[in-house]
A protein has these predicted regions:
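Active-site beta-strand/loop microenvironment that shapes enzyme catalytic pockets
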Residues: 7-51
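Short, small-residue-biased leader/transition segments that mark boundaries at the very start
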Residues: 1-3
Length: 128
């Protein structure tokens, strides 16, 4: 089994919004990498995350015979493909100093590499 990781950052984003006293507007969240992505996903049942990770690992296997590009190892091209199939930016509404998300929704950094990486997420806000 080949599980990568995902990191929820909903609370950190809401804290950033509150700390900057942003009231109503739009936030754009982007990741500056090509081997990780951003997703909105259920944050209540951890099994959903495991199923999602397993689905992507089956969809895009780590099999060097399938890819030409492998400069950074066996997870290199699969990580790029998974990133291309998901999002590198998410835009959300902010109302009353808080992200507008559904009851079970959370923001996740979806890591596609085997080894842990340092990732940079950029937040940009438009509004009052």
């Amino acid at each position: 089994m080949c599980i990568r990781d995902r990191y929820e950052f909903t609370n950190q984003t809401n804290k950033w919004i509150k700390d900057n006293e942003f009231n109503n507007g739009i936030i754009n969240i982007s990741i500056q990498h090509t081997s990780a992505s951003l997703i909105i996903q259920e944050n209540a049942d951890p099994d959903v995350q495991i199923d999602l990770l397993n689905f992507f690992n089956n969809l895009v296997p780590m099999d060097n015979s399938l890819y030409i590009h492998s400069t950074e190892g066996k997870d290199d091209m699969p990580a790029h493909i998974k990133s291309a199939l998901t999002n590198n930016q998410i835009s959300l509404s902010v109302k009353n100093n808080e992200l507008i998300l559904g009851t079970w929704q959370g923001l996740y950094l979806f890591e596609h590499r085997i080894e842990k990486q340092n990732r940079l997420i950029v937040l940009h806000y438009l509004g009052d």
